[in-house]
């Protein structure tokens, strides 16, 4: 009879499952971008039509034609208010499926002050340069910008227009172009090709402008893309984008006052 105390056998613990930190590659990112843009256009269209219907129900004497929707500031402001949450929700879902924290994936971190200063200086240089070139070539600011401001003011929706154009619109676009697309493209395509591609795509969606001003948007996109790569901060590019749009609102107000 064995009197030695029995020693219980301890089974080794199974290793905890490791979550795969998936990152969407360039083509998967581009594939996601298509339905996201569809959502943007769809919700902007639905928002514009819904606002037109509601407005004409409340003000039957004020007719908003289909042709004027693209330059009606109240309609545009409401359409951005409707579309931005939908677009941001879809992008949030895409990032969640990547299993990478949202802040890391989209570079949602505060920038350094020196990057802020450099960004302001570069944007000022681009805007001054394109402004001088516009004067030399006889380019005039599109008239629909003043129409957009006036129609929003007459509808009593100027605060909503400012919020949509200075906050919601820039944040939506930065999350899309310098956030989702930049993160998906840069590791495979390289930083500079990604800067150029995202700037070009960003300019293309502004089809309401003439070619000259689309070129200006492309140049701004190059600066914002470079700053995104240098600083690693999407909040920096959002703030600068909002600053540019604020200046555009001031310009629209000056045009409308003439």
Predicted feature descriptions by range:
Residues 1-105, 113, 249-258:
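N-terminal, membrane-interfacial amphipathic/helix-forming hydrophobic leader that caps
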Residues 83-87, 161-164, 216-220, 224:
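Hydrophobic core segments of transmembrane alpha-helices in multi-pass, intramembrane catalytic enzymes
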Residues 53-77, 99-169, 187, 253-258:
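Juxtamembrane helix-loop-helix connectors linking adjacent transmembrane helices
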């Amino acid at each position: 009879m064995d009197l030695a105390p029995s020693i219980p056998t301890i089974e080794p613990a199974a290793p905890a499952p490791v979550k795969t930190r998936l990152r969407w590659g360039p083509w998967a990112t581009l594939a996601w971008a298509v339905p996201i843009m569809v959502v943007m256009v769809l919700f902007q269209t639905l928002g514009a039509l819904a606002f037109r219907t509601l407005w004409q129900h409340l003000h039957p004497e004020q007719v908003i034609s289909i042709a004027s929707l693209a330059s009606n500031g109240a309609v545009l402001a409401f359409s951005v208010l409707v579309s931005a949450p939908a677009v941001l929700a879809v992008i949030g879902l895409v990032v969640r499926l990547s299993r990478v924290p949202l802040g890391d994936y989209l570079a949602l971190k505060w920038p350094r002050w020196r990057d802020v200063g450099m960004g302001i200086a570069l944007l000022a240089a681009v805007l001054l340069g394109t402004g001088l070139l516009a004067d030399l070539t006889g380019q005039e600011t599109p008239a629909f910008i003043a129409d957009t401001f006036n129609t929003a003011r007459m509808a009593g929706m100027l605060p909503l227009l400012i919020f949509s154009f200075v906050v919601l619109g820039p944040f939506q676009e930065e999350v899309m172009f310098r956030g989702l697309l930049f993160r998906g493209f840069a590791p495979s395509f390289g930083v500079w090709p990604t800067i150029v591609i995202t700037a070009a795509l960003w300019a293309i969606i502004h089809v309401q402008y003439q070619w000259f001003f689309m070129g200006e948007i492309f140049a701004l996109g190059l600066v914002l893309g470079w700053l995104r790569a240098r600083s690693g901060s999407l909040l920096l590019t959002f703030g600068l984008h909002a600053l540019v749009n604020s200046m555009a609102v001031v310009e629209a107000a000056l045009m409308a006052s003439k």
